[in-house]
Design a protein with these regions (language model features):
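Glycine-rich beta-alpha loop segments
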Residues: 91-93, 99, 104-156, 163, ...
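Intrinsically disordered, low-complexity segments enriched in small/flexible residues
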Residues: 1-108, 276-314
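Short hinge/gating elements
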Residues: 60-63, 124-128, 269-272
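Terminal peptide-recognition signature
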Residues: 14, 55, 111, 158, ...
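Short, motif-level signal for alpha-helix interfacial/capping segments enriched in acidic residues
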Residues: 32-35, 135-136, 229
């Protein structure tokens, strides 16, 4: 069953009418095909027009949709032969950040990403995708393995931000994020990062400092959440829609600013409407980018990353 967002109410009402009409016609000889087709056409057009005109705040809500595909969905349907690797060899294993060896379109890769979970139990287990220091140190370990074995790195970013708890700070959260970012920039192998949902602050940048950065059409990427920004600037989270607009959080804005390289289209109505199609589309896009990067030597890949981020800073 689809979980509707607030701005999708008109679509929800139409789809409910369609469902009621189908149920009422079951077992009857009444021909409702014409009316059903009319309503379905109207619903599809309304859904398309709604998603063509989403505001940055509405896109933020779509990026956070609970049914949106997560790391495990991409691993299951876009990658093959996944072998998970756990632990940072220092403190423990963080289930908010997962990774391991896999194959993408026949190519061996190391894949790393945030996992938010899809129900109450799994969300708690994965800490809602908020990585801890041991998670980022695990990512560093996997990136070092990728460099040692000459395997491309793929990262799937979906986090509201790194975990801000006291225990994480005590274990060196800031240092772990900085070291993970440094590891990305120093990789001697191709790296493609994809923002698949939320890309929140340093917790996202630590896995997205790649030479090619992709974003799903309705994903968001920002230095702080709209609510957090609004609370600082206006002392109220109710100004979150204004903050989202001002921060340029959408894939479309970030592509125009040169922060990301490619927007990956989503099914009409968002990735949560057709997760399998969304996953397949992104998998194809990542494989294409890896093909392009395969011709570069290690020193050229590092130079590409340096130029990318120096250009943004300048």
């Amino acid at each position: 069953m689809i979980s509707y967002l607030e701005f999708e109410k008109p679509v929800a009402e139409l789809e409910q009418r369609i469902a009621e009409l189908r149920n009422a016609a079951e077992g009857d000889d009444v021909d409702i095909s014409t009316e059903l087709q009319r309503l379905e056409t109207k619903s599809a057009a309304l859904l398309a027009s709604t998603y063509e005109a989403l505001t940055p705040w509405q896109k933020t809500q779509v990026a956070r949709h609970p049914s949106r595909p997560h790391f495990h969905d991409y691993i299951e349907h876009a990658f093959d032969e996944f072998v998970p690797l756990g632990g940072d060899r220092c403190y423990g294993d963080d289930e908010a950040i997962l990774g391991g060896f896999a194959k993408l379109d026949g190519r061996k890769v190391v894949v790393i990403g945030h996992e938010k979970g899809n129900d109450t139990a799994s969300r708690i287990r994965h800490n809602f995708g908020m990585g801890k220091p041991e998670g980022y140190r695990k990512a560093i370990r996997l990136m070092e393995l990728a460099g040692r074995f000459g395997l491309p790195v793929v990262t799937l970013v979906d986090t509201s931000g790194a975990f801000p708890g006291v225990e994480a700070e005590e274990r060196g959260q800031a240092e772990a994020i900085a070291r993970s970012t440094e590891a990305c920039l120093a990789l001697p192998v191709p790296m493609v990062a994809a923002i698949v949902g939320e890309g929140g602050s340093g917790g996202a940048v630590a896995l997205a400092s790649a030479e090619r950065v992709l974003m799903m059409e309705h994903a968001v990427y920002s230095v702080i959440s709209p609510e957090g920004c609004a609370s600082i600037l206006w002392r109220t989270a109710e100004k979150a829609p204004d903050a989202a607009e001002a921060m340029k959080v959408t894939a479309q804005d970030l592509a125009s600013l040169g922060v990301i390289d490619r927007i990956v289209p989503e099914p009409v109505g968002g990735a949560h409407r057709d997760p399998r199609l969304a996953v397949s589309t992104l998998g194809t896009a990542i494989a294409e980018e890896l093909d392009k990067l395969g011709r570069y030597a290690p020193h050229e890949l590092k130079r590409l990353r340096e130029e990318r981020f120096l250009t943004l800073a300048g």
